[in-house]
Structure formats: C-alpha cells, structure tokens
C-alpha cells in the first residue's frame, strides 16, 4: 500500500502511533467541562464555562475549544423561552422613577432593586421576592411565601437591611406593584431612611436587572415540574441566590466574575469598607 501511494513506511507507522495515542489533556478538559455543565443543571454555555474554568480551576481556555468539547460530549445549554412581563394598571405619580435606568452605580448600598416572581411548589403557586444591589448585581435579600403581599416584600427588605449591616441613604427601586406602594412597605423604607423609586407603568426595562435575575433562576435552575414541597423550594432557591448566583455563576456585567466575588475585588481595589 505504501509503495502504491509512494509513502515511506516510517510515515505510515508514525501515523498509526499518533492515532492510538490518547490525548490525556483533552480528556481532562472534557471532564472539567462536563462537571461544570452538570453543576449548572445544564444551563451553562461556552462563555460561562470559560469563565468558571479559569476561576475554579485556573485553566485558560477559549470559547471555541469549549464549544467543541461540549459538542463531543453532546452537551446542549438550556435556551430560555419567551419571557412575559407583568404590567401595572395604575400609575403612581407620587413615587417618581428617580433611578431612570441609571443601573451603573459607584459603590455598594447606593441602589437596591426589588421584584416578585412566582414558583410552583407543593401543587400550588408560591411567590418569591428578592432584593438586588446594583453595584455588582449581588442578591442581598429574599423571601418566599404563599401570598404575594406587602409582608412578603417587607421580609425580603428586612433580610437585605440586616445582611448589609443596616446601611442608610439607600435608594430602593421597584416596579409599580401594589406591594411596594403599600403603607406597610413604605413605612419600613422610612424607618430604614431609604428613598423610594418606581418604574413607569408597564415598562419592564426600568427594572431590567431584576427581570434578568428571575429569568436566570427559572431557565437555569428551577425544575421544569416545580418543587415537591415548599421546604425543598426554600432550600433550593436559597442555594441558588445566595451561593451559586452570588459566588459561582459568572456575570457579564462583572466581566465574568460572580457578583459577590466582583464586589470583594472592587472593595479591595477601591478601599471601600
């Protein structure tokens, strides 16, 4: 055969040896990619896996190579479906939109955002309220309840206030949900010396960071069939918000760093306490 194609036998044998040789480094990379993909509950794409490979394993790898490794393993990231935004029916001219989409802030505890979403647990809808610090998009408070009332959003605010060591002068921004315009919630803001801001009616982009948080939670983490019990929902949501989202999941806003990691890094660089 070699004589027919005028190929030296040494070249043929060298080719056979290369074909039999196992690329151990590639196998290791594929294993790491699989592990990170499984940890993300099949939600991480090539960009997120690149960031996590560097942050967790110190491995610098390009998106193209990660994409190839994912294809070799048959890994396909979840694709989010169409997102339906709720709309308020009554305008609140007494609470202006003071944030006005100025989502980039210069320090922690300058602006917090809040919103409510729903989850299926124990055969019924439960409601999740969360509070996000806009500085690095870190979740600082949350609460879960069977009722989407003022008590729910107040509990999430209380948690954030204690978690962040009782800061003063925070601007709290939300949509025009009745819970955030309630007497109970507004009194709590007054007690905490916080300034209130509300989105314009029916404009989801005025509170876009919260919409993105809930979109990530539902498309990446929450089981498609919901939770068997409310306790299971509490534990799983708590882990995602306070551990995975804050400390592990790469965020594009922070150049691939998780929100809490980015905050600690920025505090060190700027000297913010």
Predicted feature residues:
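Basic, flexible linker segments flanking DNA-binding modules
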Residues: 2, 9-107, 203, 258-267
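Conserved, non-catalytic sequence blocks in retroelement Pol enzymes and Pol-derived host proteins
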Residues: 21-22, 39-42, 56-59, 103-105, ...
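An active-site-proximal beta-strand-loop segment
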Residues: 101, 105-140, 146-147
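Active-site beta-loop-alpha junctions of metal-dependent nucleic acid enzymes
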Residues: 124, 143-165, 171, 181
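RNase H-like polynucleotidyl transferase catalytic core
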Residues: 1, 79-84, 144, 172-176, ...
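C-terminal domain-tail junction helix/linker
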Residues: 190-194, 216-273
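Mobile genetic element proteins and their domesticated derivatives, centered on retroelements
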Residues: 1-5, 12, 33, 49, ...
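RNase H-like two-metal-ion nuclease catalytic core shared by retroviral integrases
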Residues: 88-90, 174-176, 180-185, 198-218, ...
